[in-house]
Amino acid sequence: MAFKDAINKMVSYFDTDEVNEVEEEVTAAKMEEPVVQEPKQRPIPSQQTSRQSQNPAMNRPTVARSQQTESDSLPTYPNRQESIDRRSSGRESVTASTARRETYQAQTTVQEGKTTIALKYPKKYEDAQEIVDLLIGNECVLIDFQFMLDAQARRCLDFIDGASKVLYGTLQKVGSSMYLLTPSNVSVNIEDMNIPNHNQDFGYDFDMKRR
């Protein structure tokens, strides 16, 4: 009996060793299971990275579209050379118009500076008023009294002389029966011809012509 009990103890001992080995294998398997399951859970970050890798590709068209819209929204300016040419042409037109204006003004000034001399042969006293009207219009008048009598010529001459003083004109004798009436803006230089002064008494040295 004692021998049998010893055999049973030895058998039970070996049985417990097997059980312990089985338990150790089970615990080792359980410890290895999370290591095996981790690769199954890791695809989640890989999916996120793949999505992130796909997102830039999807975002690129939007960036290109935004750049295209910005380029479309930017104002289009003309070429600098064209703008310079337009400015130069505008300046040339302005200078041309200015030159034309100055030429026109110069021509107008020359025309205004021209002096007209009217030759009058008064035959009656009423003609003196027409001569004074010409003086008012800033015209020079050359008066020849050869068709008037002495008395009428003196009356007409006195009237014209008084009007010339009122209008700041000048009356000068240029011949035996001729007088030059000029406005204030005209000066006349007459050479000394020993002509008597018109303010002095004088007599006509020619035969008065009748009408």
Curated annotation (Swiss-Prot):
InterPro entries cross-referenced by the UniProt entry: Cell_div_SepF, Cell_div_SepF/SepF-rel, SepF-like_sf
Which GO terms fall under biological process for this protein? division septum assembly; FtsZ-dependent cytokinesis
Q: What family classification does the UniProt entry report for this protein?
A: Belongs to the SepF family.
UniProt KW Cell division keyword: yes
Q: Where is this region: Disordered?
A: 15-111
Q: Which Pfam families match?
A: SepF
Q: Report the source organism.
A: Streptococcus uberis (strain ATCC BAA-854 / 0140J)
- Per UniProt, the ranges with Acidic residues bias are 15-26
Q: Which compartments is it annotated to reside in?
A: Cytoplasm
- For this entry, the protein name equals Cell division protein SepF
Q: Which UniProt keywords apply?
A: Cell cycle, Cell division, Cytoplasm, Septation
Give TM regions: none
Polar residues: bias regions: 44-57, 64-81, 91-111
Which lineage? Answer: Bacteria, Bacillati, Bacillota, Bacilli, Lactobacillales
Q: Which gene encodes it?
A: sepF
Q: How does it assemble?
A: Homodimer. Interacts with FtsZ.
Describe the task this protein carries out.
Cell division protein that is part of the divisome complex and is recruited early to the Z-ring. Probably stimulates Z-ring formation, perhaps through the cross-linking of FtsZ protofilaments. Its function overlaps with FtsA.
Q: Which domain of life is it from?
A: Bacteria
